[in-house]
Amino acid sequence: MDDARTLLDIKEYPDTEVQKNRVLTLEEWQDKWVSHKIGFHQEQGHKLLKKHLDAFLKGESGLRVFFPLCGKAVEMKWFADRGHSVVGVEISELGIREFFSEQNLSYSEEPITEVPGAKVFKSSAGNISLYCCSIFDLPRVNIGKFDRIWDRGALVAVNPSDRKRYAAVMLSLLRKGFQYLLAVLSYDPTKHAGPPFYVPDAEIKMLFDTKCKIHCLEKVDAFEERHKSWGIDYIFEKLYLLTEK
């Protein structure tokens, strides 16, 4: 990557047809967990969330925090340890079990009656509940509303053709006075088909502008050695804060 390249040099690409038609099945995502192809998992947690955590929480206690497509995100324990109630949804049962195991948390599991074949895993302390089902099955389960949403590796993982449906689910979960922190990736989508998918600014506005004020908090260089195999020479992560209009 050219070190002289600045953030302002990076062109915002319109979303491309090759990504719009790209589809990953739930089975393919589950296979990634089985074969441990989970380069998206961050063992130390997300640096930008860590940096903006206090501003995100605003000193409030007892918040309900939602993690869409949560995987085994270590940040779930961060929030639980601060006295908040965490709910996540993840298609991979393996990912959910690994979360509880790696965080040394005992848990119980029970079927979700509204969604055949789905389960919910609950920490023994009762402050973390992870639903093993499709995000699009969630409206059938009454999980209530949330004060905070941490969306990292979720919107960028949803098939582009499903984004409107996804945004509708997210907006339906927001409680009055919410804060929705959203991390997306910016790269040349003509060189990498995704996932993770490229989500341009215009798409975020189209999906959320009707109900949310949208503020870009930060844009950072996220390029790593592994990204070379994607055929790209730059990738930036952008952090947005969505609040009530």
UniProtKB/Swiss-Prot annotation:
GO biological process, one term: methylation
Keywords: Acetylation, Cytoplasm, Methyltransferase, S-adenosyl-L-methionine, Transferase
Sites bearing N6-acetyllysine, chain numbering: 58
Chain sites annotated for binding substrate: 40
Reaction catalysis annotation: S-adenosyl-L-methionine + a thiopurine = S-adenosyl-L-homocysteine + a thiopurine S-methylether
Lineage top rank: taxon: Eukaryota
Residues that, per the record, bind S-adenosyl-L-methionine: 29-40, 69, 90, 134-135, 152
Gene Ontology cellular component list: cytoplasm
Entry EC no(s): 2.1.1.67
InterPro entries with a match to the protein in the record: SAM-dependent_MTases_sf (IPR029063), Thiopurine_S-MeTrfase (IPR025835), TPMT (IPR008854)
Molecular function per GO: thiopurine S-methyltransferase activity
Subcellular location per the Swiss-Prot or TrEMBL entry: Cytoplasm
UniProt cross-references to PANTHER family, sorted A to Z: THIOPURINE S-METHYLTRANSFERASE
HAMAP family: Thiopur_methtran
Similarity comment: family membership: Belongs to the class I-like SAM-binding methyltransferase superfamily. TPMT family.
Protein name: Thiopurine S-methyltransferase
Name of the gene encoding the protein in the UniProt record: TPMT
